[in-house]
């Protein structure tokens, strides 16, 4: 895959289900879940002009039609989000020249949107990507990306974990086992956790 920096504007994803659900409710749910799945991935930072995610529901399951804010709706939402997340990660992993999947999760941001902006800025940073590729636990590049994410932060209130190893907190770098870090950065998937306090 190339030109993957979705804004639902060359990426195609198709999902089918047999549940009974109103088209308008399915469209609303898809729009909401696309923001936290497909619109969070990036390969090269270039947005294509024709991204698309499509969900088709034929109602053949025979269930009573799913209605918003019900137990069935919440279960379907959870399952659909799992499918969309899996597809989004598969597209990112398949990126031109991609050797690793970098996932960032931000907790403690004032809003979900702020958390998503910080996370997407981190995974889109060429300097973060090259550090992870080179197995270099350069927390400074991650902190830099957080800083230019458009969100106001105080570095003293930021904690960073790289591959589940704390590397930065309270405005200072932390000591860590370098051998363990190198081993974890060799993995094909690397997760960055950001905790804002």
Please annotate each region the language model reported.
Residues 1-197:
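A structural signal for small-residue-enriched, beta-sheet-centric alpha/beta enzyme cores
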């Amino acid at each position: 895959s190339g030109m993957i920096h979705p804004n639902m504007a060359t990426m195609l994803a198709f999902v089918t289900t047999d549940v009974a659900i109103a088209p308008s409710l399915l469209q609303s749910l898809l729009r909401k879940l696309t923001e936290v799945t497909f619109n969070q991935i990036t390969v090269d930072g270039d947005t294509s002009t024709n991204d698309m995610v499509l969900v088709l529901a034929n109602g053949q399951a025979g269930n009573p039609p799913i209605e918003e804010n019900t137990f069935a709706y919440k279960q379907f939402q959870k399952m659909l989000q799992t499918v969309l997340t899996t597809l989004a990660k598969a597209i990112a992993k398949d990126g031109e020249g991609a050797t690793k999947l970098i996932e960032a999760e931000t907790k403690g941001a004032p809003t979900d949107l702020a958390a998503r902006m910080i996370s997407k800025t981190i995974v889109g940073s060429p300097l973060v990507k090259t550090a992870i590729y080179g197995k270099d636990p350069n927390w400074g590049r991650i902190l830099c990306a957080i800083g230019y994410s458009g969100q106001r932060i105080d570095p003293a209130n930021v904690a960073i974990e790289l591959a589940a190893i704390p590397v930065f907190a309270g405005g200072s770098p932390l000591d860590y086992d370098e051998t363990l870090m190198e081993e974890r950065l060799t993995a094909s998937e690397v997760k960055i956790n950001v905790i804002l306090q």
